[in-house]
């Protein structure tokens, strides 16, 4: 789908015929504005409040029209703090939705929801802008061919492979490693595929946003010496922002990604951390707008809001957007309406397990809960499919035997079951992997493991060729050759101790 980005002078030119209203009511981030009869703005139009507060400080607040109330009043949601606003202040209707800069000028820079740079590196070329509200590509423009997107992370590539141009969800509670996994994916994809990425930080910690930026500069994903050669654009609407900004920042990031897909005809990666915060912000705004809450206090328009964002993330004949979204699961409950609604849109799910994280298995991806529509013999091939199924069967059998082991001990198991448990424990450890972005914490260098190497490694474990090796040799290594080398080192160390 071709975008029609506007190539024009700055927004000021659209304000020549100013359509002015006045603030009638302020409730937190929600403003009611009165306009003259016949001059009502459209839904989603951007309104600008300019002036000075009681202390004489300059105010410049952008809002978005959400409701037409009647009696020439509209209700709008502010995209920044409403401190200092007063009733009676003038409001300018810009006559258009929020528009943000797009194209090469966005690479290597950090933006807020309005498309304004917030990294103190000077202004951005805003000659090419695009509105954040657009319809999804028409059915006839979609591209339907299926291909795997290799990530270099063993557990992902083997058991829940990602689809090129698909939508992937990272599910997990607080502190199990969603953001670290996203950072590793950005790192691997920039280095292995040379693709352009757009990162949307939606309602997450400002510290994490800053850490990610520094990490990208260190790893060369953002090129400080020549910003234009950077591989990623960052859009942040963090926890401290009003709900309006957190609700729309995902659309700002998506608009930038769509331009790379439709006009530059590139394959783009869109990271959203965290899609739950998008729903949460929508819930806050919905309550402020006076809508009746739905299940568990969520907004009644939850499915519609999610659909309007997710349906724009797709592959067209021009290019693709592959989206990887972190999904916070409230109280680890996958049946909560927010994660449950997200599930419906995904091609693959990577579920992070607190039990594995507690064991020190990182990435803590649950091999049994994680799924992918791509894991079919006709797509990935018989060898990959068979290996993945056998890994899952072995892990499932180990899970079933854990109660018996806890009560009676390993000795009460049959010979066959003991062998299954030993292999399952090796598989569990071999599914861990040292990350490039976690080198600082783990002290071991990161590893990128190709799909062929991953399949070979698990086939060797399942065949029984490596039954003699200790299970700790498989922990936090790259390919299977490193595991055998580590086993030899462990043997040498144990002999020296004796």
Swiss-Prot record:
Reactions the enzyme catalyzes: ATP + H2O + 4 H(+)(in) = ADP + phosphate + 5 H(+)(out)
EC annotation from Swiss-Prot or TrEMBL: 7.1.2.2
Cross-referenced Pfam families: ATP-synt_ab, ATP-synt_ab_N, ATP-synt_VA_C
Keyword terms: ATP synthesis, ATP-binding, CF(1), Chloroplast, Hydrogen ion transport, Ion transport, Membrane, Nucleotide-binding, Plastid, Thylakoid, Translocase, Transport
CDD domains for this protein: ATP-synt_F1_beta_C, ATP-synt_F1_beta_N, F1-ATPase_beta_CD
Coiled-coil portions: none
Binding positions (ATP): 172-179
Gene3D superfamilies: 2.40.10.170, Bovine Mitochondrial F1-atpase, Atp Synthase Beta Chain, Chain D, domain 3, P-loop containing nucleotide triphosphate hydrolases
InterPro entries: AAA+_ATPase, ATP-synt_VA_C, ATP_synth_F1_bsu, ATPase_a/bsu_AS, ATPase_alpha/beta_chains, ATPase_F1/V1/A1_a/bsu_N, ATPase_F1/V1/A1_a/bsu_N_sf, ATPase_F1/V1/A1_a/bsu_nucl-bd
Main location: plastid
Enzyme type, top EC level: translocase
Keyword Plastid listed: yes
Subunit structure: F-type ATPases have 2 components, CF(1) - the catalytic core - and CF(0) - the membrane proton channel. CF(1) has five subunits: alpha(3), beta(3), gamma(1), delta(1), epsilon(1). CF(0) has four main subunits: a(1), b(1), b'(1) and c(9-12).
Function of the protein: Produces ATP from ADP in the presence of a proton gradient across the membrane. The catalytic sites are hosted primarily by the beta subunits.
Entries under NCBIfam families matching the protein: atpD
Recorded family membership: Belongs to the ATPase alpha/beta chains family.
Protein name: ATP synthase subunit beta, chloroplastic
Species annotation: Salacca zalacca (Snake palm)
Name of the coding gene: atpB
């Amino acid at each position: 789908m071709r975008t029609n980005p506007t190539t024009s002078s700055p927004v000021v030119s659209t304000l020549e015929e100013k359509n002015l209203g006045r603030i009638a009511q302020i409730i937190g981030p929600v403003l009611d504005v009165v306009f003259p009869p016949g001059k009502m703005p459209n839904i989603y139009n951007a309104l600008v409040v300019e002036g000075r507060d009681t202390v004489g400080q300059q105010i410049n607040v952008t809002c978005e029209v959400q409701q037409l109330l009647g009696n020439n009043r509209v209700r709008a949601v502010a995209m920044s703090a409403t401190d200092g606003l007063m009733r009676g202040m003038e409001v300018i209707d810009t006559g258009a939705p929020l528009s943000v800069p797009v194209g090469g000028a966005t690479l290597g820079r950090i933006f807020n929801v309005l498309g304004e740079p917030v990294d103190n590196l000077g202004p951005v070329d805003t000659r090419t802008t695009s509105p954040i509200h657009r319809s999804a590509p028409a059915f006839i423009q979609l591209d339907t061919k299926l291909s795997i997107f290799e990530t270099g992370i063993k557990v992902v590539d083997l058991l829940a492979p990602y689809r090129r141009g698909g939508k992937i969800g990272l599910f997990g509670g607080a502190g199990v490693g969603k953001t670290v996994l996203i950072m590793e994916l950005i790192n691997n994809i920039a280095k292995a595929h040379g693709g352009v990425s757009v990162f949307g930080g939606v309602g997450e910690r400002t510290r994490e946003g800053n850490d990610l930026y520094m990490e990208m500069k260190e790893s060369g994903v953002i090129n400080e010496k020549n910003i234009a050669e950077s591989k990623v654009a960052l859009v942040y609407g963090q926890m401290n922002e009003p709900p309006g900004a957190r609700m729309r920042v995902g659309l700002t990031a998506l608009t930038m990604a769509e331009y790379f897909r439709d006009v530059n005809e590139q394959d783009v990666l869109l990271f959203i951390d965290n899609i739950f915060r998008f729903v949460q912000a929508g819930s806050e705004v919905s309550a402020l707008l006076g809508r009746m809450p739905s299940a568990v206090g969520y907004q009644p328009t939850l499915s519609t809001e999610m659909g309007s964002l997710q349906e724009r993330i797709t592959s067209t004949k021009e290019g693709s957007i592959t989206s990887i979204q972190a999904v916070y699961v409230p109280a680890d409950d996958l049946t909560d309406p927010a994660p449950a609604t997200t599930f419906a849109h995904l091609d693959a799910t990577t579920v992070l397990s607190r039990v594995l994280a507690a064991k020190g298995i990182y990435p803590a991806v649950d091999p049994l809960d994680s799924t992918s529509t791509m894991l079919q013999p006709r797509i990935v091939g018989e060898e990959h499919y068979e290996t993945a199924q056998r890994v899952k069967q072995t892990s499932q059998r180990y899970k079933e035997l854990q109660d018996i082991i806890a009560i009676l001990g390993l000795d009460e198991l049959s010979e066959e079951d003991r062998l299954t448990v030993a292999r399952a424990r090796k598989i569990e450890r071999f599914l861990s992997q040292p990350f490039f972005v976690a080198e600082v914490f783990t002290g071991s260098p990161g590893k990128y493991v190709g799909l062929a190497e991953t399949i070979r490694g698990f086939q060797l474990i399942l065949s029984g060729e490596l039954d003699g090796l200790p299970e700790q040799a498989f922990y936090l290594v790259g390919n299977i050759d490193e595991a055998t080398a580590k086993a030899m080192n462990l043997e040498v160390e144990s002999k020296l101790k004796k």
